[in-house]
Amino acid sequence: MTTDLTDRRQLILKLAIQEFIESSQPVASELLVRKYRLNVSPATVRNELAALEELGYLTHLHTSAGRVPTDAGYRYFVENLMDRTPLSATEQRTIRHQFYQVRSELDQWIQLAGAVLARTAQNASVVTPPRAQQARLKHLELISIHDTTALMVLVLHDGTIRQQTLTLDMALSQEELSRRASRINERCADAPVERVEEFLKQERAHEPPGGDALACQVLDLIVKAMHQFNEHLNSDIHSDGLIEILNQPEFSQVERVRRMIEILQSRRALGTLIPRALSSSGVQVVIGGEHSYDEMREYSVVLSRYGGGEIVGVLGVIGPTRMAYPRAISAVRYISAVMSDLLAELYGIEGDTHWEVES
């Protein structure tokens, strides 16, 4: 929705959304005039609220005369109206200190990021480990174990190692195995799964029928391992903050609690958001009905990738659409910067963010 709003309507929409986020109660014109000392009458504000409802930014509940924001209203607020409210300098120093205390333990980074995000944004959090954006073949070795038995050692770009014992059709020396591995390395080094699949297709087309049996066997295993890696990339999600999100009034009903637990545990819906965050720069905000999964349409998600180059992860918060967006966005932005700088410092992974104190 790109409707231009007058300055007065923008102000009233901003105040109405801020008030609803803070109180969780439908917002009436009298309250806005009284609390924010507006220099207009309640009747004027009431007319403006009605106009904003006609434009699709607000709606009202049948049991109340007050208005509540729609998804379109929240979107307009996030893109045009909200004030940027960075974390305080004290909060930033505390967060940075916490991460430095565990800087050599990657698993603890992930747990700490989830806990700090949830506590800071007062919502549930999601974090994925830093990985290659997609599997790429770094190196292959074939090691002779016995006459007709070999060990395949596959190393992916992020350091992931896969091992598989192979049964050979004929006895092959270590020299011959190394030659076959070198040929695959030459053709597929730094290749994504699509290129490996293309090479496998070419091998199968060669004489003798079916091509080089060992090469095809090895390439087929590589393709399967890379597909598994890519699938795991979108499902390896650490979540935290269930206690924080259950403090929100939206979760006073048991059914909504059950649905939220299901979302955090199943990973299916959240997993669809990971590729979007990985392929985008900056903080991404997905609000309510913008989600492709129906079960996510009562919630908003604020996500950002962290890291740099090929090695990246995603972190963010999930909560009701009545989310304190400025706070959530600042928390996600700052913690992603901290994580990026840690990766750059410890692993030489260049990120595009730094630990400068936001102000």
UniProtKB/Swiss-Prot annotation:
Pfam families: HrcA
Keywords in alphabetical order: Repressor, Stress response, Transcription, Transcription regulation
GO annotation, biological process: negative regulation of DNA-templated transcription
Single GO molecular function: DNA binding
Origin superkingdom: Bacteria
The keyword Repressor belongs to this UniProt entry's keyword annotation: yes
InterPro entries: GAF-like_dom_sf, HrcA, HrcA_C, WH-like_DNA-bd_sf, WH_DNA-bd_sf, WHTH_transcript_rep_HrcA_IDD
Record SUPFAM superfamilies: GAF domain-like, Winged helix' DNA-binding domain
The keyword Repressor is annotated on this UniProt entry: yes
Function, as annotated: Negative regulator of class I heat shock genes (grpE-dnaK-dnaJ and groELS operons). Prevents heat-shock induction of these operons.
Family stated for the protein in its record: Belongs to the HrcA family.
NCBIfam families with a match to the protein in the record: hrcA
Protein name per Swiss-Prot or TrEMBL: Heat-inducible transcription repressor HrcA
Organism whose genome encodes this protein: Roseiflexus castenholzii (strain DSM 13941 / HLO8)
Gene name as annotated: hrcA
